[in-house]
Amino acid sequence: QTLQAVQTMPWRGFADTLAAAWRQGGFEVQQLDGGAADFCLTKSGSTTLASARRWKAATHGVEPLRELRAAMEQRGATAGLYVLAQGSLSDNARLYARDNSITIVQDNALAALLLAKS
């Protein structure tokens, strides 16, 4: 039910919902304009970059994860989050994420994040 609601949201509504959920989790949240990362999350001195703009794509490959990884290196982030509300992640993308400190946030993990904010 939560995921169905997310799939009908415009980008701004989804971005605001994610930011509120991360703030509820104790993160300082900075929304970024353009580029591979949409959010910079800071907590206890650690920086995490999150990419969520492609949340409605049907398939997710390695390229956006490579771009996120490059942004992580540029900003000195220790971790990355890649958010998808629908579609599937290719096997290569899943392996790339695992090997490059990128956590995939989808399905139950996404629902839990969004429900925690309410």
PLM regions: where:
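Mixed-charge (Asp/Glu-Lys/Arg
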Residues: 1-118
